[in-house]
Every structure is written in C-alpha cells, then in structure tokens.
A protein has these predicted regions:
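Signal peptide-directed extracytoplasmic domains
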Residues: 7-178
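Bacterial extracytoplasmic/cell-wall-associated proteins, especially those involved in peptidoglycan
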Residues: 102, 120-122, 136-322
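Hydrophobic membrane-insertion alpha-helices, especially the h-region
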Residues: 1-7
C-alpha cells in the first residue's frame, strides 16, 4: 500500500497538453509494500496525484519499465515534474528507497552496529571492523578512544542500500552539522574540544539515566571539579574501565583498577566517551548550570535525584542519610 506524507496535489493539462505537477513543493510518497511499475498509475490516481493513469501507464510501457519494482520506502518527488521526469526519477530511485534510520544512544559501538544492521542491509561484522579501523579514525579526525563521539544519535533519512562506508561518511556529515558555530563557541568558551565535551556528556549521561532535568546540574558539578583540578571520581568511568556496566555498587577494590578511564585514580577527563551520547546531554553540558557544588549523593527517597553540596562536611551528612 502507498501512503502520502503530504495533503494533496493535482496534475493538470497545460497549453501544450502536457501533464505537469501544479506546484513546486515536494511530496513524499511512503510505500509500505513493493509496488510494480505497472501499478503506479492506478495508485497515483487513487491518491489524487494524477487525473488519469493512461498517460503514465503508456509511458511506463514505452520505456519497458512495467516489470520493474518500486521497493517499499519513502520517495521524494516534486510537484513541478513532468510525467516523463516523474517516471524516470522513480525508476532511478526504485532501489534507493529511503527509510527512517534510528541511530540510538547505546553503551558501545558493538551494540550500535547490531542496531544499525537490523535496520539496513548491512554486514554488522564489516561495519564494526570499519568502526575499529585506525585509517577510518584518522580520516575523520579521531582516534580509537574518541571515534564514538562522531556518532550523533537521532532519526535520519537514508537509502536502504547504503553501504557500510557510505554510512560512516553519512554519520560524519551529521556530526559536522550538529557541531555548528553556536555549539563550537560554547565549547571553546569552556576550553574543550568536541570530543572532550562529548566525553564529559557521556559521564553525565551514565551518571543520571533517569532524571534528564538533572543533567545540566551534574555537568556543572563536574566542570567545577575540573576547574579546581579535582579528580572527577565518577562511578560510571570505573564501571566502564572494569567492563562491568551493570555493577550496582563500587567497593574500594574496584577503585584501584589501572585504567585511564578510572577517574578515581587519574585527574581530568578520560581519553574518550564511555557511551554513545544523546545529543541532548551534550547540549546540557554546553549549557551547564552555574553553581558551586562539587559533591553529590543519591537522595534517600530513591526518587532518582541527588543531593548536591559544596563542602565535604555537607556531603558526609547526605551520605549518612542515604
């Protein structure tokens, strides 16, 4: 079945008796099932996109397109196109249909590859190999630690037959679009580059996965600690270093893990993100809350929120309450 993501447009006959589309705006056709070219005319008429299927059917037959298949997906056409151009464009796009690709915020690149491959006709092993390829990292200005910061989760329109390499190029293009001058100015004002901002955002995200409205406040706390040359002492970084993301409680033995990601042991930011970061958290870091807090502790109410404090004495009080 074919659905339209646009209200309506008509085909009319101009002075040269040539069928043209009556406006210049685009129309998006959404095809839920594969459609034979011989069926296109009737479908367009049923959706009030053509006055009659006769001309387009004759043209399709003349071009020997009738046995071709328009695969399910989304196709963008223009109102101003002639019938001839409409048929030609649909023929060119028949195997390049568009889908909404959801790039999720997940724990690591392995999970991401599985999610992407399930939506596209991709080899997940090949895609993961490319994600770990140092030449790919260098090509786009990253390294093995920072490459995951290039992924900006969102829903994007892509061709279903996109290759693994083209997908990475597409992801890189969306990264560049996301980091516009406004965001870059804010990052520069903080004194960090994009990967460092994303790394900090990944810690904020993994620290608070329930109450999103607390992200900017937590970001402000970590920025205060960085400015004060204090260790971040962020539990999620230790869990990442241990490869134990579901560890419920950290003990002193865990804090001794020798890893650059262990922010209990080393000052500053870890070398790269500890997850694929939701862009909203990146924005929360760029627009962090300004305060003097340097400690936080989960509230005893188990509400998902934290008690924040600016002194160790106050922090110890909250710890006892918890």
């Amino acid at each position: 079945m074919l659905y339209l993501i646009f209200p309506f447009f008509n085909l009319f006959i101009n002075k040269e008796k040539k069928e043209i589309l009556s406006d210049t705006n685009k129309v998006i056709l959404k095809i839920q099932e594969d459609l034979s070219f011989s069926e296109i005319g009737d479908y367009l008429v049923s959706k009030n996109l053509l006055l009659s299927p006769k001309t387009i059917n004759q043209l399709i037959e003349f071009k020997n397109f009738e046995n071709n298949i328009l695969k399910k997906g989304k196709y963008t056409i223009q109102r101003k196109w002639s019938t001839n151009k409409l048929v030609n464009q649909l023929f060119l796009m028949r195997n390049q249909n568009v889908i909404d690709l959801y790039i999720p915020s997940v724990r690591n690149l392995e999970i991401l590859c599985g999610r992407l491959s399930s939506q596209l006709e991709l080899d997940s092993a090949k895609l993961l190999h490319l994600f770990y390829d140092e030449n790919i990292h260098e090509k786009f200005g990253f390294n093995s630690y920072t490459f995951s910061s290039m992924v900006i989760p969102n829903t994007y329109e892509v061709y279903t037959n996109i290759s693994e390499n083209k997908l990475i190029e597409f992801i890189a293009s969306k990264y560049k679009s996301f980091w516009n001058s406004k965001r870059m100015d804010k990052a520069n004002a903080l004194g960090y580059n994009q990967s460092e901002i994303t790394t900090l955002a990944s810690i904020v995200q993994m620290e608070q996965q329930i109450k999103f409205d607390e992200h900017s406040k937590i970001a402000g706390l970590y920025i205060n600690r960085l400015k004060s040359n204090m260790k971040l002492q962020a539990d999620p970084t230790v869990k990442f270093a241990l490869k134990m993301p579901n560890l419920r409680r950290l003990y002193y033995k865990h804090l001794e893990v020798d890893s650059p990601y262990n922010t209990y042991k080393f000052k500053g930011l870890p070398p790269g993100p500890i997850c694929i970061v939701d862009p909203r958290v990146i924005d929360a870091v760029l627009n962090y809350s300004k305060h003097d807090f340097i400690f936080m502790c989960a509230k005893p109410s188990y509400s998902g929120y934290h008690n924040f404090s600016s002194t160790n004495k106050e922090h110890e009080k909250y710890k006892k309450m918890y």
